Amino acid sequence: MMLLYYILSFILLPVYFIIIFIRLLIGKEDIRRIQERFAIGKQRQNSLLDLQMSVNQEGFKVDTEHKATSYVYIHRNASLMYKLSLERSYAQSLVWIHAASVGEVMTSLTLIHNICKLAPNVRFLITSWTNTSAKILSTKLPKIATHQFLPIDNVIFTRKFLSNWKPDLGIFIESELWPCIINEGAKHCKLLLVNARISNKSFKTWLKRKKFFQLIIKNFSKIIVQSECDLQKFNALGISDAMNLGNIKFANEKLLVNQEKLSKLSLHLDNRRVVVFASTHPEDEEVILPIINNLKEQFVDCYIILIPRHPERVKSILNNCKCHNLLATAKSQNDLPVLSDDIYIVDRFGEMGLFFSVATISFIGGSFKQGGHNILEAAYFSNCIIFGPDMSKNTDIAKGILQNNAAIQIKNGEDLLNTLKSLLNANNALKLKAYRENALKFVEHNQKILDEYLHVIKPFLP
C-alpha cells in the first residue's frame, strides 16, 4: 500500500506544482522560500542555518565579533532578511521537530527550550507547513534552531530533504501524518509522535484505511497521545502501544509581553473593560460583529479587540465592520486603539500576550466550525474564557476547564451576547472574578505534564 502511495505521488506531481502555484497567488506561500517545498537550499553539512528573520535597514553586514559564530545579514527587497549562522558543525547532533501550524509551533518551542537542558550540544530543525507558523518562528526561534518549510510529500523531495539534513531524531507533533516523509524519515533516524490526536472526522477516514494507518504509525518508536479519547481511537485503529500523558500544551510557557508596550497600552485604555476575541475565523466574525453595537450600548466602558487567526484578512474584516455600522481601525493603521471606535483589529503577529494582559474576558475563536484553538494561552493571563460549541480539536482541555468552572461554552450569537452582558454586569463582579481565578488555577495545576513527556523523550536523544 505504501508503494501505491509512492506511485501516486509521482503521478500527481504536476498537481502538486499547480497547488503550490495557486497557494503563491493567494498569498499562502512565500516566493522567497518556495524552493524549500522542493528540498532545495539549506542543508546540515557546512550549511548556513537560517536562525531568524528580521529587518535590517543597513543592507549587508558581517559581524565577526565572536570567534565561535559569525552572522551574515542579507537585506531583501521585501524588507525581510535571513539571519544566518555558521554556529553549528556537522558533528553536532540534530533533532528535527515537525510542527504543522501555529499551535504545534508553540509546543515545539517549549520542547526545544527544555530538551536543550537535557542535551546542551543538540541543535534543532523545525519544519512546518504554513506561512503563519513561519512568521511566528521568525521572532521566537532561538539561535540553536532553524526553520524550513516541509517539502512536498513526494519520495524525490523527501529523500533529498533527509539527505540534506540527516537528522538524528525526529519528533512529530499532534496529527499531521505525511506518509512519505514519515516512512523515509524512519530509515534515517528514530521517530517519535508526541501530543498525538485524531479528530473525529479523521478517525472515520482512517477506519476505512486502517492498514495504511498502521503502516504509517509503525514507523514511530514511541507514540504519546494527548487524551484518553485519543488513546481509544489509536487502539481502535490497531495501535496498542500508544501511551496517554495528557496535553503538552499545558506546559507551553506564558506568552511573552513587552512591559513597555503594556504600560503604554494600559494607560491609553484608561480602565476600560476589554473583551478580546482571539484567533478568529470568518465563521466566528459572522457571530461576533452583529452583537457588538448591542453590547456597547449597554456597557459604554467596554472596549472590543479582535485578533484574527490570519491577519492578512484585515481588509475583509474592516469591510465587514462597515457593513455592520461599526467603526474599526487596524493596528497597522494605528499602533494604539482608537477609543472612539467600536472595535480594534490586531493584524500583527506576536502580540497576543499583550492584549490578553489587558483583557477581562476572552473569546477563543475557531470554536464554531474549526474545532477550537488553544484556550490555555488566555488562562495564563487569568482571563474569563468563553468558547463556542465546536471544541472537537481540544475536547479534553475544554471538558476539564468547564468542569473546573474556569470557562463558559456558548451555543450561538444570542447566547454569546447574553453571556457577555451577564459577565459585564456590575452585580456579577464576584462571578467574573471567580472565573478568572479558576482559569489560572486550572492551567497551573496541569503544568507537571512536561516532566512526564521529557522522561519518555530523553532516552531517544542523540
Swiss-Prot record:
It catalyses: lipid IVA (E. coli) + CMP-3-deoxy-beta-D-manno-octulosonate = alpha-Kdo-(2->6)-lipid IVA (E. coli) + CMP + H(+). The chain crosses the membrane at residues 2-22. The active site is at E104 (proton acceptor). Coiled coil: none annotated. It holds the Pfam family Glycos_transf_N. GO terms for biological process: lipid A biosynthetic process; lipopolysaccharide core region biosynthetic process. Its EC number is 2.4.99.12. Its main location: membrane. InterPro entries: Glycos_transf_N, Glycos_transf_N_sf, Kdotransferase. One of its GO terms (molecular function) is Kdo transferase activity. Pathway: Bacterial outer membrane biogenesis; LPS core biosynthesis. PANTHER family: 3-DEOXY-D-MANNO-OCTULOSONIC ACID TRANSFERASE, MITOCHONDRIAL-RELATED, 3-DEOXY-MANNO-OCTULOSONATE CYTIDYLYLTRANSFERASE. Involved in lipopolysaccharide (LPS) biosynthesis. Catalyzes the transfer of 3-deoxy-D-manno-octulosonate (Kdo) residue(s) from CMP-Kdo to lipid IV(A), the tetraacyldisaccharide-1,4'-bisphosphate precursor of lipid A. Belongs to the glycosyltransferase group 1 family. This is 3-deoxy-D-manno-octulosonic acid transferase.
